[in-house]
Amino acid sequence: MKIACLTFNPIQENTYVVWDDTSEAVVIDAGNSNPREDAALDNFIAEHGLRPVLAANTHGHFDHTLGVAHLKKRYGIPFAMSLKDAFLLDNASTSGSIFGVPVGEMPSVDTDLDTTPEIRFGHTVLRVLRTPGHTPGGVVLLCGEYLFCGDTLFAGSIGPVSYTHLRAHETGA
């Protein structure tokens, strides 16, 4: 399995392209947000001779879904995400405006990761593990020693993780 991380959009979201020796690829958390970023992702796919077969998301926040509609149109691939996060797609424009990020067309979900135990492509299997917290439909995708976790560590929020309680424990304060 090979993995590439591309960072997109003003929020600096990480998009992962995962593929194996069959050249079949899954794009995880497609955050490409404009024609320049769409082209960067398309060029990466072309330069590596990849055949995208699925766009999959760890959760439904706008910064992780901005590029999914492009992938669905360009490559004719389905989109997999928990339907528990579908409401976030409906509210993406409002969420984006809060962060000053224009949000275009949001995709429809083709495969519900709540009822999908694994994603298979080429010779690769990604196990789908449900991790609600950051969003109601949050999932992580596990393959061997690699875990694609999106924003799972941000339970109920986004941004830096606070280690205040750890510092207090370490110092006895």
Q: What residue spans do the PLM features occupy?
A:
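Conserved beta-strand hairpin/beta-sheet module of binuclear metal-dependent hydrolase folds
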Residues: 1-48, 140-150
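Core dinuclear metal-dependent hydrolase active-site scaffold
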Residues: 3, 17, 116-142
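Short catalytic-loop micro-motif centered on adjacent basic/acidic residues
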Residues: 26-29, 54-57, 128-130
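Active-site metal-binding loops of divalent metal-dependent hydrolases
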Residues: 30-32, 60, 134-135, 145-146, ...
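Active-site HxH/HxHxD metal-binding segment of metal-dependent hydrolases
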Residues: 32-38, 42-121
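A short acidic, helix-capping loop that chelates divalent metal ions and anchors anionic groups
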Residues: 88-91, 156-162
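Well-ordered beta-strand scaffold positions
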Residues: 117, 124, 145-146, 152, ...
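Conserved small/polar residues in nucleotide/adenosyl-binding loops
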Residues: 164-171
